[in-house]
Amino acid sequence: MKNFLKTFISVAHCAALLAFWSFAVAPVFAGDTTNASFVEPYDYASPKLLTATLYAIGSDRQDVLYTFRRTATRSNNIVHVERQFIATNGSIAAVEKIVYDSGRLVSYEMQEFQAQVSGAIRIAPDPKNPARQQLIISYGPGLTPPPGAAESLPPDTVIDDTLYPFMLAHWDDLMRGKAVKFHFVSLDRKRTYEFRLVKTAEFVQDHQTVEQIKMEAVSFLVAEFINPIILTVEKASPHHILSYLGRTTPRVKKGKAWKYLDAETVYHWS
């Protein structure tokens, strides 16, 4: 049971988180499980480039594990996002490719070249009821994701790249001390789990006021085995995520095996 719980959240999902760089699934999925977006759809094409550095936790930002690069391009209503995790030798350790249409998630694909695994997510209309949306998740060995099984799209479903817009949509509630729940996609378990965001502190860092927001599993059983993700966010608009501690996409080699990685991810906003 412990091993099952320790592995249920995969690299590209909790931290997925991710490199949680923070720009997300259609910002928020409506409670009726349709693929709804903000009144004004979030612009996933901005910024065109975002970078980050992933450090070993506890190294005082000295031990670099990976660098992160997110690029976005727009063609009419379609936005293509590519998120690369680059090893210290310059090789690409993992890549995530995401497609949005009019601010709504269409597809997500992850390839982890070191561990030789891949996964994919699709949001599509239910053939039997096109007014409702389906979530199709696949994951397996090899660099080509296998076919996935469809299920109803849960309300407020979030992936790595959609966490930031979801957080923005609920910013006022978070600042009032309310916990905001959502469903986070776990590729390797091919399902979603319920998580919540909650503000835990406010302090001054590098001459600016920041908020500390914790992402944690709602289930006590799951939370016992999964460390929370700790986000440090600008208090002032646009509330950029400056850094986070927790699970990220590329793995780290321990002995002969590639293990899931918790790291400190620091974003470089220009």
Task: Give names to the regions the model predicted.
Residues A15, L135-I136, K214:
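Compositionally biased, intrinsically disordered low-complexity segments enriched
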Residues A45-P47, R132-V210:
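Solvent-exposed helix/loop surface patches that form functional interfaces
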Residues G31-G103, Y108-D126, K181-S270:
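Acidic, serine/threonine-rich low-complexity disordered tracts
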Residues M1-I9:
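N-terminal secretory signal peptides that target proteins for export/translocation
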Residues V11-A26:
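Bacterial N-terminal signal peptides
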